[in-house]
């Protein structure tokens, strides 16, 4: 059993949303070490069940995307105002969201490891669910007359379900009196992803 926890902070988010706690843990149960498994040990070398749960945070935004900025620029053309050419003017930048926070990734996994025939045959199976919550993306469309791009917001959630099966075989034999080692492996996998919130 292993337990971990991260407490991360980022200045890319506004006060009150800068910190996130991201725990994770994993469990393993080696069935082949149990006493009731002894009759199978001459064939099965290792049989282990695994389970894990983990969370991570993503801060893939600009450094100060939550702060509204005011920019200055020269007036176009060669107009003169009060004997000054190219006068400056100020304008507000694109709108921002004051509630940006961490994009959260939650990964759940169960698995099985199997070794047989003096560890020549190996099999590993994993099934997982991966949820990404509060995906950082552009918000709802603004009217074109507004003249500015949409602010970044934590708008979408996506869920991915999948599995992976790996087979492996390794052995050796002699060629011209010298040992020859070889190994073969194959992997089958599939997954489906869909938005659960848009």
Regions of interest found by a model, annotated:
Residues 1-198:
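Extracellular/periplasmic, surface-exposed regions of secreted and cell-surface proteins
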């Amino acid at each position: 059993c292993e337990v971990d926890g991260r407490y991360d902070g980022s200045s890319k988010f506004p006060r009150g949303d800068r910190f996130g706690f991201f725990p994770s843990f994993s469990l393993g149960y080696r069935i082949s070490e149990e006493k009731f498994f002894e009759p199978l040990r001459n064939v099965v070398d290792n049989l282990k069940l695994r389970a894990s749960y983990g969370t991570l945070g993503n801060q893939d935004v600009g450094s100060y995307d939550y702060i509204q900025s005011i920019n200055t620029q020269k007036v176009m053309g060669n107009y003169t105002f009060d004997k000054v050419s190219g006068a400056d003017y100020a304008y507000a930048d694109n709108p921002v969201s004051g509630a940006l926070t961490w994009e959260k990734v939650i990964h759940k996994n169960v698995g099985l490891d199997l070794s047989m025939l003096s560890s020549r045959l190996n099999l590993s199976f994993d099934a997982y669910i991966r949820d990404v919550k509060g995906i950082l993306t552009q918000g709802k469309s603004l009217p074109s007359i507004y003249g500015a791009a949409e602010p970044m917001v934590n708008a979408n959630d996506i869920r991915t379900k999948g599995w992976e099966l790996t087979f492996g075989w390794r052995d050796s034999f002699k060629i011209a009196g010298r040992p020859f080692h070889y190994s073969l492996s194959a992997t089958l996998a599939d997954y489906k992803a869909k938005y659960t919130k848009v």
